[in-house]
Amino acid sequence: WILLLGLRHLRPTVFTAANSALDAGGVVGEHKFQALAPLQHNAPDLAAVCTRIAAGDGPLRHTAALRFAEVHGYPVVLKPDIGQRGRGVFIARNAAAVHDYLARFNGAVIAQQYIDGDEFGIFIARMPDQPQVQVLSIVHKTFPQVTGDGQRSLQQLILDDARARLIADTLFARWAEDLQRVPDSGESIALVEIGAHCRGSLFLDATARVTPALVATLTRLADAVPGYAFGRLDLRAPSIEHLQRGDGLRVLELNGVTAESAHIYHPGTPLLVGYAAMFRQWALAFRVGAARARDGAPVTGPVELLRRFVTDLARARQWF
């Protein structure tokens, strides 16, 4: 389908022009901080405060991360500046965890303020002549949790939970030191804290929750990042009601062209419905990219895209 669209538009990678705010349109290998920096400068009320810590293995990295945590408090989110699908994302709750993370990963890192609340992924698109963004998809990311009964261990609670046992190996590694602990009766334990489907989050379709107030806030957000016109915003809000009012939103990441309209992962969504959504998304990506290319946005060529994919495969070995 992508090849067909490329032939139709006579430029196979014109979709990369949809997001000049990100390297190669955010297809692969983009720097997350490239879009987060202008957002927190131009619309600080919509951003989770973050800073970029340069690659290396010297003590200055540790000092910078600890200083950030001292100012903004724990927990602090640490993640690769270049990364995808939640790989390498870690929530550090103390200085020892910060030191351990930086010792294991010496690439460029983003330290970000931890934002509590409900997490959402909102896919937006905008043609050059549109005054407001259009919302293609909203997904409500929920995190599996178990409740203790005073009898079963955490390991058994995980195995007895229909959702949690599907990712038991991941959860066992995450909770290795607590698996034999018996939670108190009524004690609730959030097993996952990172909003990535591959990390165990459950994605629920919330597209019907879109409101004019939300669209207005998302438009202001897009205006704060020049060149950002097509992609998924991962953000948190105090509640879904706050989201609908466009109130209290804090962006965690701005993803590019290859991000997915994640509502397709809603449990029970037919496969053909998911494919249809992705076909529509890619058709729109080409239209937005072509329109912005005509306005002068840069297009990344096929050879450069291939190089980026190869580099990304090698980079993935560093993540944990």
Which stretches of residues belong to each language-model region?
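A transmembrane-helix-recognition feature enriched in membrane-embedded lipid enzymes
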Residues: 1-20
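Active-site nucleotide/adenylate-binding loops and adjacent lid/helix of ATP-dependent enzymes
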Residues: 21, 31-173, 211-215
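A short acidic, glycine-rich active-site loop
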Residues: 24-27
